[in-house]
Each structure stands twice: as C-alpha cells, then as structure tokens.
Amino acid sequence: MKIKTRFAPSPTGYLHVGGARTALYSWLFARHHGGEFVLRIEDTDLERSTPEAIEAIMDGMNWLNLEWDEGPYFQTKRFDRYNAVIDEMLEAGTAYKCYCSKERLDQLREEQMAKGEKPRYDGRCRHSHEHHADDEPCVVRFANPQDGSVIFDDQIRGPIEFSNQELDDLIIRRTDGSPTYNFCVVVDDWDMEITHVIRGEDHINNTPRQINILKALNAPVPMYAHVSMINGDDGKKLSKRHGAVSVMQYRDDGYLPEALLNYLVRLGWSNGDQEIFTREEMINLFSLGAVSKSSSAFNTDKLLWLNHHYINTLAPEYVATHLQWHIEQENIDTRNGPQLAELVKLLGERCKTLKEMAQSCRYFYEDFSEFDADAAKKHLRPVARQPLEVVRDKLSAITDWSAENVHHAIQSTAEELEVGMGKVGMPLRVAVTGAGQSPALDVTVHAIGKTRSIERINKALGFIAERESQQ
C-alpha cells in the first residue's frame, strides 16, 4: 500500500505553529514510508477565507521547505463533485432532504437543553413522506446509522469508540446548495486516496461522522492519528499573548526554518534524549507510535537555543541566504563591507537570531554619525589619545591586511606603551564600531577594512580633542 497523507488548512488566517507541526508530522510520515504528501486548501468558509491567508499558508510551507507532491487542491473548485456525490446518496437513501425551519430547530434545541439532553436533530424529515415543491428551500442531511457504534484505532491514542446514538444526522448540503466541511473532507480523502489522516485532537469528534459517511459510500476508511494541542509555558492554550504564533512571524523575528522544524518535531515526539535532528534524521526516525498523547508546552527559550545552535553549525553561506532578507529590512547596503557569510562567522556566537544580527552589523558597512554616549564617555577620554594614535600608525603601516596582522598591531601597541591590552582595545573598539561591544577586535577591524578603520580612529581622536578643549 502506498502511504498518502495530507495537510488541509483552512485559509482563515496565517499558518500557526500548531498547523505547522501537523503539516510536519504528516510530511515526515509520508517521507519515512516513501509515500506522498498532499496540500489541500479547505476554503468552504467563503466569508472567512481570504487570498491573503492562502498566500500566508503557502509562504509558511515554502519557508519551512515542506514540499508537497500533489496540490494545492481547493475545495471551492470541487463543488460539482461534492454535489454529485450528495445526489447519489439521496438516490441511495443514505441522505435525505430536511425542510425544518430555523424556528423549529431553535425551539427543538431549547426544549432538549431544558431537559438536560444533548441538542441534536430529532430525525423528523428522515421519516417524513410529505410532498414538497422542487424549489422549496431545504438542507440535505446524512442518514447516520441509528444503532451500533463507531470504533477506530487512533494511531496515537489507541482505540476510540462513539455510540451512533450520540451522533446527529449532520447537514451535508446547506440551503444555498453549498456542501459542508465534514462532507467535503470525506470526499476529498476518498478521491485523493488518503491512507493516513494526521490532525489535531480537536477533530476527534468529527472522525466518527466522517467514518460513517465513508462507509455509506463504500469507500476505504483511512487510519486516523490525532495530535495533542500545544500550550503556552503557563499550561494554557497557545495564543498571541505567548509570543509569535505565526510561522512567518518567526521568520520575521530572525529564526531559521531548521530551528523551528527541529523545535516543532520535539513538541510531542521524541527519540530518546536526542534534541538536535537534521531533516534526514527526522525522516528516518519519525513514527506515530512515538508521538505523545499529552499536550506540549511551548518554550521560546528552547527555540532560541536551537536557533543559536543552527546559526553556528549550518554552512555560513546558507545562513547568509536567510540573513539577506533581514539585512534588506534594515536597509543596509552591503556592497562596501564583508560578505554576508563572513558576517555570519563574525556575529554568530553573539547573536541568537538573524534579526539581532542584522540590527547589530551596520557599522561593518556604513559610517556612523556619532559614538554611543556611554561607551564614548568611558573609553574615548584624553588618556586614550596616545594608544589610538600609535595603533593607527601601526595599522596604516600594514601592507598585508589580515586579522593576524591587525592583532599584532594592537598587541605591539600595548607592549610599546607598557599598558594592558584593554587600554588599547577598548578605545579602538569604540572608535571603529561606535559602540562598546563587538566580536573579537582583530577580526572586526579586519572586516571593517583598513581605510575605513583609520578614518574612524581619526574621527575618535577628533572627538577626544574636542572633549579636551571643553575641560
């Protein structure tokens, strides 16, 4: 049997981390078994579905590199197929037309609730032989079995059973002729030959209804696996107040897709104590049997740790391709300065996100108009004038501009003046970067370049001279 899974988001908003994890698990399961992964857009909610949301879902899937083998299919383009199946069911007697008014259904619901009963349709039209005009408004309901039960072996939770007496004759076509969600899903899974449905636990109650419809159609029933919810670190359902929940927001905040995927796969699945997984390892090791039944807690600190790990372990050239977007957001012209791959090497240890890296690298490419006030007050004092003049002259004399030779110039200045390295290094750092923090000074000065470094030292000396004149 060829394994076939699907990810079927509704385009009523962005791709959130819960949906991304479901997509990842479905994708991994298909890839592990050499099967196929289908992308289906469940856009039957015409009022809430938007083109922007569809684009956001596609952007998220592409950024995570969860490539699909079929699709994207759109349910709104398959209405003719759904209605044809409904008409066949009406002919076969597995569905029926319901003419009950909204007022009657509301009254029925109120009466049932007053008696402490579960609100459900009473089947009046199922057994009715009244004649109705062809143009009289009606819905179509599925004739759910009235006895027995539905049992399915959830691939994560084990056997789950529902009594058919607890299930309603659900509406499968509205009065406006549009098919409903639960019915469209069934026909899609049938037509697309889906073998395994992996989705959130909030769909468990839909499963017996969908299984009954599949059986009424004499269609194969897929295996189902329901993944537990993701909570915030406070134990409550993950929401915006816990931080970013949109996949693309994590991109915007400077996370690498590898970090988010690695984090999401561990939110409910494990392989011993292993924390770091390459994409290939995820594919080789993933199984539904190792997915936890318990809900998971989202921990941003853990995600940040993973992101820092991947910034420093993935190829700098690859990380640079993602950094480029953040550099553009900061409007930094990188033509006059180090290559972005070199920047990743320079700042990787200090920066936990690419956004942080982009926001802290401007001095490598552009001159600054003023020094950081606190850093200048502390380090650009009259006592720093001589160390800066000496190190400037030594840097000017370098013919082979390298980090090693820059380091030698700084060290020999300290030795010549018989001062500690900090007495040279800190004023030099503020002079060339404008701030009090940077990567190692020799590689920083080397990356900034000889001409620009000397110009900035002269600017710092001018700042010191002006400071002296005001005393």
UniProtKB/Swiss-Prot annotation:
* Motif position, 'KMSKS' region: 237-241
- What Gene3D superfamilies does the entry give? 1.10.10.350, HUPs
Q: Name one GO biological process term.
A: glutamyl-tRNA aminoacylation
Q: Please verify whether the record's keywords include Protein biosynthesis.
A: yes
Q: Where in the cell is it found?
A: Cytoplasm
Top-level EC class, please? ligase
- A GO cellular-component term linked to this record: cytosol
Would you say which domain of life the source belongs to? Bacteria
Where is the motif named 'HIGH' region mapped on this chain? 9-19
EC code: 6.1.1.17
Q: What does the record give as the organism's lineage?
A: Bacteria, Pseudomonadati, Pseudomonadota, Gammaproteobacteria, Enterobacterales
Self-association state and partner proteins as the record states: Monomer.
Organism source for this protein? Salmonella arizonae (strain ATCC BAA-731 / CDC346-86 / RSK2980)
SUPFAM superfamilies, per the entry: An anticodon-binding domain of class I aminoacyl-tRNA synthetases, Nucleotidylyl transferase
Tell me which residues bind ATP.
240
Q: One Pfam family, short name please?
A: tRNA-synt_1c
Q: Keywords in alphabetical order, please.
A: Aminoacyl-tRNA synthetase, ATP-binding, Cytoplasm, Ligase, Metal-binding, Nucleotide-binding, Protein biosynthesis, Zinc
Tell me, what does this protein do in biology? Catalyzes the attachment of glutamate to tRNA(Glu) in a two-step reaction: glutamate is first activated by ATP to form Glu-AMP and then transferred to the acceptor end of tRNA(Glu).
- Catalytic reactions of this protein: tRNA(Glu) + L-glutamate + ATP = L-glutamyl-tRNA(Glu) + AMP + diphosphate
**Protein name as it appears in the record:** Glutamate--tRNA ligase
Q: Which residues bind Zn(2+)?
A: 98, 100, 125, 127
InterPro entries named in the record: aa-tRNA-synth_I_cd-bd, aa-tRNA-synth_I_codon-bd_sub2, aa-tRNA-synth_I_CS, aa_tRNA-synth_I_cd-bd_sf, Glu-tRNA-ligase_bac/mito, Glu/Gln-tRNA-synth, Glu/Gln-tRNA-synth_Ib_cat-dom, GluQ/Sye
Cofactor binding mode and count: Binds 1 zinc ion per subunit.
